[in-house]
C-alpha cells in the first residue's frame, strides 16, 4: 500500500495500517527529501557554503606565506667546547649537571669522578645524598653536581618528577677489558667487555625548552666531548701501562634536538592553522541546525509527518560529507603548498586524521544542539569553542612533545585529572596526532611518516609509570570513540531536553518497551471535574460516549508543566479538554495569549505529549499512534515553515513528497493549491522575495496539499492584506466539506465568519462551547448602544436617561465620554423604537446638553469573549 491514498470512506481511514516494508520506504523517502533540501539550500547559499568549504585554503596559504617569508632564528644555539655545561635552575631552587648510571659499576664511577674533578663538580649518590623521590629534600639550593643513579630507568623517573632540573643523563653500557682502578682491574664490574677495547655509553639529553619562546641550547656535543676528555685524561693519569691502549669510545645520543627545516613556522604552528581550517564547518553546523530550530522549521516538518530520526540522520550525512570534503581540500592544498607535513605523510593517515577530527567535532555540535534553541546562542558557543581551541592549539603546538610527556608520564593527581578531562576533548587527540606526525615529517625527505608508524611506541627509554604515551593509532582510535560517545549523548539528550516544541521523555526512556515499539504508550486518565456551563458538560458527555464516531474526539486532554527545582509551581496549560468535531465542521478556538490554544494544537499534532487524556483522530490515538494521525492531518503553523533559499514550488514539491503523493498526481495538486492561494505567477521566485502575506498564503497552500482529512490552522491569516485575507477565508470555507478544520485566531470577525462551532478557552479551561448565535444569545446583551456624552458633567444624566428608558438595560463600560449600554433583544420593539426616536431628537437639538452622538449594533463576539473572560476571572478570585 502506498503511504498516500485518497480515502473514500471513514472505515478505510480508521483501519488503514502501513506495513513494515512501507514504513522502511517512508523513512528512506524522508531521508532523501531532507538531503535534497539540505543540498538545495547549500547551493542557493553559495557564499556561506563557499566560506565553509574553502576556509582551509585560506588558513594553509597564510601558513605557507608565514613559513616562507617570516623571519627569526630558526636554529638552536650549539656549543662545541670540551667543558661540561653549567646547569641553570628554572622552576625549582636546584639543578644538576648530569645523572649517570649504573651505580654498581666501579669503572663508571671512576670516569665520572674524573669528569667532576676536571669541571669542579661533586658526585652525589641517589638516594642517600639527595633524598628520595619525589621530594629530594637534601638538594634544595644545590647548583651543579653529578647524581649517581642505580639505573637509566631511575634517571627517567627522576626527570618525570622534576623536569628541567638536569641537563642530561649518561648510561654506561660497556667497559674495556684493560680498564684499571688504582693499577688493578676493577672488582665486580658488571659492564666489563671481555672481547674488545671499546668503552660505550649513551647520552640522553634534555631538549625540553623551559620557556617555549626561548631557543633551546644543544648540549649533546658538549657533554659527549666532556666525557671523552674525562676518559682520555683518566687513561693518561691513572693508567700508565703502555701495553694498555686507550679505548675506542662509542656513544649514542637520544632525544637529539631535531633542527627545524626551512619552514620552521609550518612545523611549530601548523597545528593551529590546520585546526582553524577544520573548525569553520563546526560553527556553520551549529548555526544551520539552530536556525531551523529557532524558526520552527524542524517543528513544522515534524507536524507534517516527518520522521525525527531521519531529520538528524540527514544532518549527520550532510555534515559527514562536508567534513570529508574539507579534509580532502586541506590535504590537497597542503601538498600544493609543498608543506613537509603533507609531503612526508601517508595519504591515508592524513585523510583518517582530518576526517575523524572534523566528524568528531560535528558530533560535539550535535550534542550541544540539544541544549541550544537560538542562532545567537549557537554562534556564541561556536565562536567561544573556536577561540578556546585556538589558544589550546597555540600552547600545545608551541610546547610540542613535552606537553604530552608531562600529561601522560607525570605521576600526580593533577596529571591524572588532566588525562581524564582531555580525553573527552577531540582537539587534544588531534593535536597529539599532528605532533607525532610532525616529529617525523620535520626531517622530510630523510624521514617520512608511514602507515605502519601508527603503532610506533612513543615511550622512549621505557616508562616507569602505569600510564604510557598512546601511539598515534591509539589517539586516532580515541577520536573514533569520541564520535560514538557524543553521538549517543546527542541522541539521549535530544529525547530528554525540551526543545522548541516542548517535548521531552523521561531519563529512562530507552528502557521503556513503548519507545522501541514493543507496546503502546499508556494513557493516563484523571477524574472529570465539574463545569458550570451546561453546554460544556454536554460536549464532554458526547465526547466520552463510546458510540461517538466523530472524526476528532478529544477526551480529558490535559497538559501541565512542572519546574525541576520548584515542583510545587505546576503550570496547567490545558485542563481537561473534552469535545468532538464532526466532518465538515470548522471549530474555532478563541482565547487570550497563554490560554492553551497553541498547546492544544501541539498535543493534537504530536509535538507535545499530554500529561493526561487522549485524542482520537479517525480512531487513531495521538499518544500511541501519532504516525497514523500525521498521515491524514496537516498544519498551518503559527510560524511559517519556509526556507528563504527555496521557491514556493520547491516547497510544495518537498511537502507533497513528504505526504507520499504519487509522482503522477504531484504536479497537478501543486498547481491546484498555487491557484487557490494566488501564487502561480510567482511560484518560481525565492521565498526571500516574498512579503509576509505571501508567505502566509504559501503556508496555507502547503497545509492543503495531499487532501488531508483534518487541518489545524494556527492563526492562518496573520499578516495578510485585507484582499488576500478575504480570499483565504473563502478558500477555507470551500474546502471544509469533507474535512475537519481546527482554527485558532485573535480575529473575532474571522472566527465568526468561518467557525461552525466556537470554543472560548480561559486559563487552559474550556469556558464555553457553541456556535456564534448561541454564544451571543447566552453571553451577549442583545443590542449594544454607544452614546457620546457632551461633557463629563452630563454623564450621570445620560446614564439615568438610558436606564429609565429601557427596562433591563445595563451600563456596560465607559471610555472617556463614550458610554456603552446593553439590553436584551426580548425588549418590546415599540419601546426600542421610541428610545431610538428620542435619541435622534436629542442629538438633533442644538441646545441639548446631554449627548453629541449615538450608535446601535448587535452584541459582537468581542463582547461575548470579554464577558466570558470576566466571568471566568470572577470565579478564580
Curated annotation (Swiss-Prot):
Q: Where does ATP bind?
A: 591-598
Record-annotated membrane-spanning stretches: 46-66, 268-288, 324-344, 347-367, 379-399, 420-440, 479-499
In terms of superkingdom, the source organism counts as Eukaryota
Location of this chain's protein in the cell: Membrane
Task: State the membrane topology.
Answer: Multi-pass membrane protein
GO aspect biological process, one term = lipid transport
Which keywords does the record carry?
Answer: ATP-binding, Membrane, Nucleotide-binding, Transmembrane, Transmembrane helix, Transport
One Pfam family cited in the UniProt record for this chain: ABC_tran
InterPro entries for the chain: AAA+_ATPase, ABC2_TM, ABC_transporter-like_ATP-bd, ABCA, P-loop_NTPase
Gene3D superfamilies linked: P-loop containing nucleotide triphosphate hydrolases (3.40.50.300)
* Molecular function via GO: ABC-type transporter activity; ATP binding; ATP hydrolysis activity; ATPase-coupled transmembrane transporter activity; lipid transporter activity
Q: Which segments constitute the ABC transporter domain?
A: 552-788
**What are the GO cellular component annotations?**
intracellular membrane-bounded organelle; membrane
Entry's family note:
Belongs to the ABC transporter superfamily. ABCA family.
* Protein name, entry field: ABC transporter A family member 1
Organism per entry: Dictyostelium discoideum
